[in-house]
Curated annotation (Swiss-Prot):
Its main location: cytoplasm. It holds the Pfam family EPSP_synthase. Keywords: Amino-acid biosynthesis, Aromatic amino acid biosynthesis, Cytoplasm, Transferase. The gene is aroA. Pathway: Metabolic intermediate biosynthesis; chorismate biosynthesis; chorismate from D-erythrose 4-phosphate and phosphoenolpyruvate: step 6/7. 3-phosphoshikimate binds at K20, S21, R25, S166, Q168, D312, K339. This is 3-phosphoshikimate 1-carboxyvinyltransferase. It comes from Streptococcus pyogenes serotype M4 (strain MGAS10750). Its EC number is 2.5.1.19. It catalyses: 3-phosphoshikimate + phosphoenolpyruvate = 5-O-(1-carboxyvinyl)-3-phosphoshikimate + phosphate. GO terms for cellular component: cytoplasm.
Amino acid sequence: MKLRTNAGPLQGTIQVPGDKSISHRAVILGAVAKGETRVKGLLKGEDVLSTIQAFRNLGVRIEEKDDQLVIEGQGFQGLTAPCQTLNMGNSGTSMRLIAGLLAGQPFSVKMIGDESLSKRPMDRIVYPLKQMGVEISGETDRQFPPLQLQGNHNLQPITYTLPISSAQVKSAILLAALQAKGTTQVVEKEITRNHTEEMIQQFGGRLIVDGKRITLVGPQQLTAQEITVPGDISSAAFWLVAGLIIPGSELLLKNVGVNPTRTGILEVVEKMGAQIVYEDMNKKEQVTSIRVVYSRLKGTIISGGLIPRLIDELPIIALLATQAQGTTCIKDAQELRVKETDRIQVVTDTLNSMGANIKATADGMIIKGPTVLYGANTSTYGDHRIGMMTAIAALLVKQGQVHLDKEEAIMTSYPTFFKDLERLCHD
């Protein structure tokens, strides 16, 4: 598709779609809780729809009523062996978390994904789940999908130190641990997003978080809840950056989830000189509205414990850095290489093709700014965040056109992205 270029100031108010991480977990926990769980504000992107379809195939009744998702949970014992292969589409979250959940079920299942998901390593969940007594295997020593899993009704608790910072691996182990008899401990390398821990407790589960150590004694039963999903900060990030780098812009981003394990991007942009104001902050619900205006920015260093708190925002932060004065250095982000694409390489190649000055490193990028961006032929490579980053970059282009292939990937997390973009350009 041909992207909008040479945009004037962006003006207006955006209600970003529901948080993807919380939407997945609301469906997963609701499916094994006892009773009727109702979810408001659910993200209806393709990844979450993959999770919903998987649980329908596992015998859970899920339907939409009055703009809510209603899940009829029957407890952990209520899942039934699927008649077909579980297709997770492009969703690594679905595959890893549901594999953890199915670890304690007395049946076997085959899990597949699309071409992109089939290139993402599952060894990170295979090894701890095997230690718990699950028969699980993928292709090659990296355990690429498809995954074959035979659950075990007598799961063993484990103490497991995560070799990488990964909320998905932590979550897979905790979902299995809810069905294991005894004490499971997970020790994190760096603290990652904690939605699974918070939501297990919201559904009546018990666990103890002590710094980087999470302790859960199983087995446990969960109770149905009413869940309201806040707006996704990872989706809001695209408008946050657009407002900061397009001269004359002023945007209000409403109802954005600001769980502290996800707010790394806000700390980074403020350090770079961003003018942002928080309005209607609700600390208990961890939501706020964010007012953002065009700002002159300076380069910064992003590394260490900050990385897991903004891992999904790094592509759009890279674009931001191309417009900042000086050098921005992103380190300790090797996890980007095994996302939907090798995001270090794809971000570097895409933005450099438009005139940026970025050097890829083994674990990050060195970005020199400010640079003028020009037209180019680009692709999402099937990665939603690359697509949205490119669409925001195109707004800065004064000369030439920007063409984007495989734009349908954006449906993964933000089905109304282009509609919202047009509205902000015209408001």
